Amino acid sequence: MGEIIHRSKTRPVRVGNLTIGGNNEVIIQSMTTTKTHDVEATVAQIKRLEEAGCQIVRVACPDERAANAIPEIKKRINIPLVADIHFDYKLALKAIEGGADKIRINPGNIGRREKVEAVVKAAKERGIPIRIGVNAGSLEKRILEKYGYPTADGMVESALYHIRILEELDFHDIIVSLKASDVRLAIEAYEKAARTFDYPLHLGITESGTLFAGTVKSAAGLGAILSKGIGNTIRVSLSADPVEEVKVAKEILKAFGLASNAATLISCPTCGRIEIDLISIANEIEEYISKIKAPIKVAVLGCAVNGPGEAREADIGIAGARGEGLLFRHGKIVRKVPEEKMVEELKKEVDKLAEEYFAKQKA
């Protein structure tokens, strides 16, 4: 596969201290599972998401208690905050006033034009964007009557309906999502959207399932979309701790070379030649490098048959043998280490590489 091409013609949109679209990297987003009015629990979860690599976080804003919590939450976190609003324009106004960096609301669903105008005016004054969220499971009645069932054409038509409402009010800081739980439908909808308008696209396979099944489904769908150069932000939706969503999203982006601030692990599937405890070593190293924000490729390989050749693809790696391992750096043997010190020595080398990377970045 050739290099992934970003949709460089996508309109850039500011969200807090980030710019989405243009030539910028794909941004990882997640959503809290706490009651938003419970500020302590919500902030604690967002802090965990930040640590895992989440770059934008969305909170549900179903009522006034949730909207009233926005200012305090915003004050205590370090990443842009998105308020998710349905139907009630007053909650959108309150969230904007409270410091939300973006709101997710469909303008066609909040009533009379003056209500939409009030939300747009407030968003303009604060310089925050609006995400239009189209979902195959909640398309407008007129769309379903026209197409008979959720289709990609219907989803794009729904998005355009909401986009035009905002454009008529001279509002263009728009982000669009077209989510479906059916992977093929989502892929087709995003492809059509990318050909139809230049607003940034937020990717997601909605209601994808539990940690295992949802990871597979999201990787299949989001991977297919990303491989076409489509997408500016991404959320993996799982029936699991949202930290797991961030981990999966990061791995999907790394698989396509779209994450410049994350370390990657290569490890072999093991076979009868293995004479070291490779699985536990690989798991420990994976956990160790998960918080390293440098594009380092680390290999943990089980034997001397394929190990040296595969290690050449990595920046640093270890190939196990009988009770010892060969430590490689950029494909060349650095030294032999006993099995009991393999993990410790590999971690030291990873740290050195990370320090070298950060030193170059500062230079």
UniProtKB/Swiss-Prot annotation:
Listed pathway(s): Isoprenoid biosynthesis; isopentenyl diphosphate biosynthesis via DXP pathway; isopentenyl diphosphate from 1-deoxy-D-xylulose 5-phosphate: step 5/6
Question: Which EC number applies?
Answer: 1.17.7.3
User: Sorted alphabetically, which InterPro entries does this protein's record hold?
Assistant: Dihydropteroate_synth-like_sf, IspG_bac, IspG_bac-typ, NO2/SO3_Rdtase_4Fe4S_sf
Q: Which UniProt keywords apply?
A: 4Fe-4S, Iron, Iron-sulfur, Isoprene biosynthesis, Metal-binding, Oxidoreductase
Provide the residue positions that the database annotates as binding [4Fe-4S] cluster: 268, 271, 303, 310
Which co-factors does it depend on? [4Fe-4S] cluster
Q: Which family does it belong to?
A: Belongs to the IspG family.
User: What protein name applies here?
Assistant: 4-hydroxy-3-methylbut-2-en-1-yl diphosphate synthase (flavodoxin)
